[in-house]
Amino acid sequence: YHVSYWGRPHDYLWLGTFSPALLYNQMSRAYDSGIRKMWILNVGDIKPAEYQIELFMDMAWNMDTVRSTGWKKHFAGFLHREFGSRADDILPLMTEHFRLAFIHKPEYMGNTRTEERDPKYTRISDLPFSEEEILERMDCCTRISDKVEKIGRSMRPADMDKYFQLVKYPVQASAQMNFKLLHAQLARHGKSEWEKSDAAYDSIASLTETYNRGFSNGGKWNGIMDCRPRRLPVFNKVERTPSAEPLPAFPVPAYEWNGIECTAGSFTACEGLGYEEKAVSVAPGDAIHFDFKTEADTSVLVELCLLPVHPVDGRNLRLSVSVDGGKEHSVDYATFGRSEEWKMNVLYNQALRRIVLPLDATGRKHRLTVKAVDEGVVVDQVRIYAPDDIAALQQKRKS
């Protein structure tokens, strides 16, 4: 299992942003599938992934003990051991940090790739984000970065080295990477100043220098933190290249749910997993239901946002979708390694499927049913759009 990765579609060697929720979910599934003799973890540089390593090792040693509390309480115990009562303030900031990185890792924010023949992937370019999405993400980064800074001011000097290494550096360096690339994206379209992107680049260098120098540890870890692994283009200062194209705007869904917000059904909540930490696992043969109402449409476009995983049994990863107990439409979202769809699933941590479903009547409530066929189905989010929205949504990301 990898919590650090070198390869396509893009490395993540810098910060330990791998989702503990995903690690917990997938190793639990492996354990339940009978894989209990040997687990191997690829950690790369040990320092950035200290918590993920501890979670993995504790699950391997005694899965039942970790399961008795869940990974968040396990993480809280880790933080309490290191920071005492301050852990209560740190925990929500770190879980939000992991959530943002689950949506898009800091190393992915430049829309570049590794091991691609097309040279366009070596150039930093726009992500398919609207201005609203960009500003919302930067606001989230600012909030946790500011709170981490405030806690650090009251941290005991003896604890500053570990606080900086475990909390402040990963949260603030990740935030600055987002600022560097998102301000650049806005600046390309005349919506921000290039100087803000450049300042974020300088901040990353300054934070890294502090990490390596240390506070009272005599430079024990000097040189271990490199903020430009493999000197990939995404780590560079962003070239000032204006764009004549407007920032994209995307359709707003008529309805949007996280998996756990289903009206009814049989599911298992996946602690802390998903874009809003509300994904659910649906066992084969079980279903979840979402109620909605339309006024005039005779059909709806359903967008399924699923956790991208490999098939557990065989080659398929199937579910079915239906409305009002009607025909079940089969959906298979299994992918093959190194395919374009697989790469997009890795970069965005969601597998997308869109399907237009007919409605028998308008102006009344309808029930959308999502039923798992194969083992491994995890539903993160479900959205309903007007059928005509499909072309614009395909511009954001193909399904």
Can you annotate each of these PLM segments?
Residues 221-399:
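Extracytoplasmic
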Residues 1-259, 365-366:
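Substrate-binding groove of N-acetylhexosamine-processing glycoside hydrolases
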